[in-house]
């Protein structure tokens, strides 16, 4: 089964860019409608959902993509994997949703967080079911190499979510209205995904047991270790908000969440690469193409570093212009945490494709050890720094925790058997970033209008960065030719 890595990355990254462009004008509308306090409550619920999702999904999203992509002799293999994982998904999500609802019904939630959170937790119980169904549908499509089908569903989902969320929030429903928007959008996306799947697989597979020689224990073992790994990864992502909200209050949590949203713009390409590389590298590991894996990992890691450094320089320089214009003057407090987060976000960005290749081999034990080191460091620093410095302390702690992921996972990759930094060209990329900063920082300072600065500086910065990257050898002509040859024809025609 051949795959086009570039097509997969472009499909996922392209969908994420469209989702971000859609969210770009609508997020500040939602933030201003909710206010900083309610937005902080919403951020807390998203963080809770992120941590709970680890146990609810049970490793299904990664497991489906890894195993359904493998080229097995059994012609019914894909149907067996789909049916097996669908049943596992239902087995995980239904009891989990009941537990969340019982926590709200019993008064535990209101006694700890406040009465307004009771309704939020009831809605999250429904949202977990909707997201689980959507995750199964999308992961099967992706595992089959149909990212060009799975990713437009994300765009459609946001077209459903935003009108409902903003409309209900403006009508006075608040955070509950936003959660209702998530539920409706996720359910509709799930239905569309299964309609698309019906063209490639037999949906009746969910009712039929796989044969006795089906490797259930292997798949379950992968899932169990994936749950641990995903819990650690989500702990890294949400520890700051989960600690900041009760310690420093909803206002600071809201400002900090705004900084996180902007910083995570850097993850569009890294997440796309991470998503595609899991099932792509799984094929290569299964056919013992270790040399090709090392070459692929080194190239992808360099491209990810190149792109994220460009974005980080732009965000760091333009933060003063962008944040108040985007979120409103009240959110100027988000600027410093945003800049503090950027270094760590770049490090985690580079670590993402390395992590995915390790998952593709199934070497989860080593990945768990590596991630545990970063999580422990992140937790310790957040516990120490948040009580002392509030959201700035959270930003410093989280940035160090994110950055340590690169150190730990490079060590892990070498133990697994591939070298992701063999072609990183770190000095050349940093030189391109430095030259770009020297050009655009005074340019931004010289432009009085924030809006004009946001229109003028980015394209100039892009030209300077790419030109410098080529001049110093961070990006060479062979790279450009290779990218051109592997880019889908319709994308080439779009820019020709």
Tell what function each PLM region has.
Residues 172-175, 179-182, 193-237, 280, ...:
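Interhelical loop/hinge segments that connect adjacent transmembrane helices in multipass membrane
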Residues 56-73, 143, 263-308, 355-359:
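Helix-loop junctions and terminal segments of transmembrane helices
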Residues 3-61, 93, 97, 121-127, ...:
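Signature of the first transmembrane helix
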Residues 129-154, 176, 342-374:
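Membrane-interface junctions at transmembrane-helix termini in multi-pass inner-membrane proteins
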Residues 122, 153-202, 260, 373-378, ...:
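Hydrophobic alpha-helical transmembrane segments
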Residues 10, 15, 19, 42, ...:
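Transmembrane helix-bundle signature of multi-pass secondary active exporters and lipid flippases
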Residues 106-124, 315-349:
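Interfacial segments at transmembrane-helix termini and the short loops linking adjacent helices
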Residues 441-496:
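Membrane-proximal transmembrane or re-entrant/amphipathic helices at the cytosolic face
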């Amino acid at each position: 089964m051949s795959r086009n890595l570039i097509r997969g990355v472009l499909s996922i990254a392209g969908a994420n860019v469209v989702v971000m462009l859609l969210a770009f004008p609508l997020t500040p509308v939602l933030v201003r409608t909710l206010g900083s306090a309610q937005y902080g409550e919403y951020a807390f619920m998203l963080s809770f959902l992120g941590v709970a999702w680890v146990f609810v999904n049970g490793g299904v999203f990664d497991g489906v993509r890894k195993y359904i992509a493998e080229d097995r002799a059994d012609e019914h293999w894909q149907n067996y994997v789909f049916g097996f994982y669908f049943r596992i998904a239902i087995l995980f999500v239904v009891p989990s949703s009941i537990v969340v609802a019982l926590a709200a019904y019993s008064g535990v939630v209101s006694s700890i967080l406040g009465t307004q959170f009771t309704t939020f937790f009831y809605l999250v119980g429904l949202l977990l079911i909707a997201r689980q169904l959507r995750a199964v549908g999308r992961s099967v499509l992706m595992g089959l190499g149909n990212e060009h089908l799975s990713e437009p569903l994300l765009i459609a989902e946001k077209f459903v979510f935003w009108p409902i969320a903003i409309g209900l929030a403006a009508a006075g429903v608040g955070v509950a209205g936003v959660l209702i928007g998530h539920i409706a959008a996720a359910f509709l996306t799930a239905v569309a995904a299964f309609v698309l799947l019906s063209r490639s697989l037999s949906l009746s597979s969910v009712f039929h047991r796989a044969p006795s020689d089906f490797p259930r224990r292997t798949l379950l073992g992968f899932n169990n270790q994936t749950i641990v790994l995903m819990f650690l990864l989500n702990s890294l992502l949400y520890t700051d908000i989960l600690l900041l909200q009760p310690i420093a209050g909803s206002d600071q949590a809201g400002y900090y969440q705004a900084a996180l949203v902007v910083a995570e713009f850097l993850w569009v390409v890294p997440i796309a690469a991470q998503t595609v590389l899991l099932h792509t590298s799984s094929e290569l590991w299964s056919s013992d193409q270790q040399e090709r894996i090392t070459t692929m990992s080194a190239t992808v890691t360099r491209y990810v570093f190149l792109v994220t450094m460009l974005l980080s320089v732009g965000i760091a320089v333009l933060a003063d212009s962008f944040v108040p214009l985007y979120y409103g003057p009240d959110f100027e407090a988000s600027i410093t945490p945003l800049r503090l987060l950027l270094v760590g976000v770049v490090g985690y960005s580079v670590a993402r494709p390395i992590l995915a290749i390790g998952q593709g081999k199934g070497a989860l034990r080593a990945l768990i050890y590596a991630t545990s080191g970063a999580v422990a460091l992140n937790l310790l620093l957040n516990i120490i720094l948040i009580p002392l410095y509030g959201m700035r302390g959270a930003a410093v702690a989280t940035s160090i925790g994110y950055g340590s992921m690169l150190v730990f996972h490079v060590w892990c990759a070498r133990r697994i058997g591939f070298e992701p930094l063999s072609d990183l060209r770190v000095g050349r990329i940093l030189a391109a970033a430095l030259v770009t900063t020297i050009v655009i920082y005074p340019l931004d300072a010289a432009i009085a209008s924030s809006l004009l600065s946001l229109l003028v500086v980015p394209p100039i910065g892009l030209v300077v960065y790419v030109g410098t990257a080529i001049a110093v050898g961070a990006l060479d002509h062979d790279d450009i030719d290779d990218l051109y040859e592997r880019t889908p024809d319709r994308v080439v025609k779009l820019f020709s």
